[in-house]
Regions:
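AAA+ P-loop NTPase catalytic core and its hallmark functional loops
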Residues: 1-150
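Alpha-helical lid/collar subdomain of P-loop NTPases
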Residues: 131-214
Length: 214
């Protein structure tokens, strides 16, 4: 069990992620929110940011540093902290819009549908138990070296895919290739290979990081 902090981005202010400015002894600092202090104290928790595409642009901008650097205010959440977000598609989200491109590029996007039979089973207390595969540090490091050569070779042959901004409005707020998201692919594939995950899962991770076209 890992500590979980759920934050509804749609009802938050920028300072709930960027920190509250305060002046003490002639210097300014950013006081981190309570959820950040709780996660930092734990060191291995999960931040679940819900409804991020109904958060105003100023809040989405404040989320950038949290997502990439794992820093809220002046507080580091710790390398062991994981960040997960959820959003309904803009066409069905109430007052929703596409994610800003800088924020969208900081996530692996996975479309999630909950089967009716799973919901029915969960209503009577039978939610499925999921076993998370394990991998050793040595295996991950080995796979990282191997995948880095594969990825370098691919981008050398397809340099136009190193960075490709979304070309249509339908792709706004989704995954697209940049050096940052290719690094996501490298790390995800290294872990997936070390865990012996199925090919279809690896495909979802790649598409979720750099988009369908890449």
């Amino acid at each position: 069990g890992r500590k979980l902090e759920i934050v509804l981005a749609s009802i938050r202010e920028p300072q709930d992620f960027a920190g509250l400015p305060t002046i003490s002894n002639g210097s300014m600092s950013l006081i981190p929110p309570n959820w950040a202090q709780s996660l930092a104290a734990d060191g291995n928790g999960i931040l679940f940011a819900d409804e991020i595409n109904t958060a105003p642009p100023s809040v989405q901008a404040a989320l950038l540093r949290v997502c990439l650097e794992k820093v809220a205010g002046d507080l580091e959440l710790g390398a062991g902290t994981s960040i997960v977000a959820a959003a309904n598609p803009p066409e069905i989200a109430a007052d929703g819009w596409d994610l800003a491109q800088p924020l969208a590029n900081r996530f692996c996007h996975i479309d999630w549908e909950l089967p009716a039979e799973v919901v029915a089973a969960g209503l009577v207390g039978n939610w499925p138990n999921i076993t998370i595969p394990k991998a050793t540090v040595e295996d991950i490091e080995r796979e990282t070296r191997e995948e880095s050569w594969k990825l370098a070779g691919f981008l050398s042959s397809r340099p136009e895919l190193a960075t490709a901004m979304p070309a249509s409005t339908g792709q706004q707020g989704r995954a697209f290739p940049t050096p940052r998201s290719w690094e996501f692919v490298l790390r995800l594939m290294a872990h997936a290979n070390a865990m012996n995950l199925r090919p279809e899962i690896k495909r979802l991770l790649v598409i979720g990081s750099v988009g369908q076209g890449a």
